[in-house]
Amino acid sequence: MVGCVWQAGRFEIGLDKPKIMGIVNLTPDSLSDGGAYSQNAQTALAHAERLLKEGADILDIGGESTRPGADYVSPEEEWARVESVLAEVAGWGVPVSLDTRHTVVMEKALALGGIDIINDVAALTDEGALELLACQADTGICLMHMQGLPKNMQINPKYQDVVGEVARYLKARAAECIAAGIAPQRITLDPGFCFGKTLQHNITLMRHLPELMAETGYPLLIGVSRKSMIGELTGETDAAARGHGSVAAALAAVARGAKIVRVHDVKATADALKAWEALGINL
């Protein structure tokens, strides 16, 4: 596997121990927090600061909801949502990730400075995205697998071999990045839980994360926090109340080799990981 350091802009993030990526949603239609942080920048910044105090290693800031059935958001609207928050946190001296699939938004953020990671649910397939990132010397990249688009991805997703198909797609996208001149240590991969997958597909992927990591050869970033699979597993219909199940799923991912977990409930996840380590469980 590619080494235990993720080159992410201004930072070399050690992956010898699992890292926590804290979520800052700036979307008014977020299922997980009801758009609580989309009303004004100060509310969002206070939330981001709290996540860091609770143990987040990375802040992941996004302005487009990619939940199942979500409507398309123009790059202009997305940028209007994230610009002021990105401009502020870029000066905090912590790793900052931008969750976007739009080249225009990536370009504006990178020109702003202080953005260390592009976290892309579309794996740099938007026109010009791959070329833009290839021109950056150090920006970290997370490539995610998604079958379909957010609007339709949960309408009857099908696979012959979900682990193999996800692995082959991600491996191919990473290879295209390498061919474009992107250094392998800049790349992490996300299998895309709940992005064009049924509950059984998600369970199968979780159980086979070691094989997925071995097949692709890259560190895995896992995002299952408050998602529909947690609701289906626990019976909890309120996304905001899925924290306990989300922590359990994050631990399951780490136990199977995940290097970064993207979460809403940072303190609970950080405490759980600390307890595991103190109890001698190999993370």
UniProtKB/Swiss-Prot annotation:
It is an enzyme of class 2 (transferase). (7,8-dihydropterin-6-yl)methyl diphosphate binds at residues 66, 99, 119, 190, 227, 262-264. Residues 18-274 form the Pterin-binding domain. Gene3D superfamilies: Dihydropteroate synthase-like. CDD domains: DHPS (cd00739). Changing residue 105 to I: In strain: 418. Changing residue 102 to R: In strain: 1014 and 418. Mg(2+) binds at residue 25. Changing residue 135 to R: In strain: 418. Its cofactor is Mg(2+). Changing residue 68 to L: In strain: 418. One of its GO terms (cellular component) is cytosol. It catalyses: (7,8-dihydropterin-6-yl)methyl diphosphate + 4-aminobenzoate = 7,8-dihydropteroate + diphosphate. It comes from the Bacteria. Keywords: Folate biosynthesis, Magnesium, Metal-binding, Transferase. GO terms for molecular function: dihydropteroate synthase activity; metal ion binding. Changing residue 87 to V: In strain: 1014. Pathway: Cofactor biosynthesis; tetrahydrofolate biosynthesis; 7,8-dihydrofolate from 2-amino-4-hydroxy-6-hydroxymethyl-7,8-dihydropteridine diphosphate and 4-aminobenzoate: step 1/2. InterPro entries: DHP_synth-like, DHP_synth_dom, Dihydropteroate_synth-like_sf, Pterin-binding_dom. Its EC number is 2.5.1.15. Catalyzes the condensation of para-aminobenzoate (pABA) with 6-hydroxymethyl-7,8-dihydropterin diphosphate (DHPt-PP) to form 7,8-dihydropteroate (H2Pte), the immediate precursor of folate derivatives. NCBIfam families: DHPS. Belongs to the DHPS family. Homodimer. This is Dihydropteroate synthase.
